């Protein structure tokens, strides 16, 4: 008798050019292309968990003058472990993708600032609005995992990322494997 060893899952690691090619496929196949491409790049740029990405706010990405916060901070209330940590927006592709998405948001008047606060700060967006919104213009809903497990999750963000990975043509890629790519760099 020879025991059969279960197949180990092959770790899917994407190179920067594969990420860019996948982002281009998403741009062609998605109804919310700017947001979806920005989500890809923010995931691979920051290594944040899906729930943390759902909790990011405009002020985490932008300074009040509208410039990008290249060295930001994952606020304690955003981080899963409740501790702040550095958050870097230094990838030119990631910043270009998020900027294109924010231009679209302002054009569609999603999460814009009230006129009294002025349209010249935070590029006219409400600094406390979620950085990423659903197709309907709402923040991604965060809730408990179940009746016996009160830890928080963001099912819609996870489903959105799965859908994006499928559109990108990436098999075996998950948010967790994307985070491993960041950890290995």
Regions found by a protein language model. Give the residues of each.
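Conserved catalytic core of the tyrosine transesterase superfamily
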Residues: 1-185
């Amino acid at each position: 008798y020879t025991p059969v060893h279960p197949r180990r899952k092959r770790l899917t690691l994407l190179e920067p050019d594969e990420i860019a090619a996948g982002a281009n496929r998403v741009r062609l196949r998605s109804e919310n292309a700017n947001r979806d491409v920005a989500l890809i790049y923010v995931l691979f740029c920051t290594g944040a968990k899906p729930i943390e990405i759902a909790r990011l706010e405009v002020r985490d990405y932008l300074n009040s003058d509208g410039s990008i916060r290249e060295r930001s901070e994952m606020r304690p209330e955003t981080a899963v472990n409740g501790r702040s940590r550095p958050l870097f927006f230094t990838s030119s592709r990631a910043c270009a993708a998020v900027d294109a998405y924010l231009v679209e948001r302002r054009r569609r008047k999603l999460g814009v600032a009230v006129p009294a606060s002025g349209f010249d700060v935070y590029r006219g967006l409400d600094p406390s609005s979620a950085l990423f919104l659903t197709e309907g213009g709402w923040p991604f809903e965060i809730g408990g995992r179940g009746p016996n497990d009160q830890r928080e999750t963001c099912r819609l963000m996870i489903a959105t990322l799965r859908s994006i990975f499928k559109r990108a043509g990436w098999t075996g890629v998950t948010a967790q494997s994307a985070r491993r790519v960041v950890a290995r760099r």
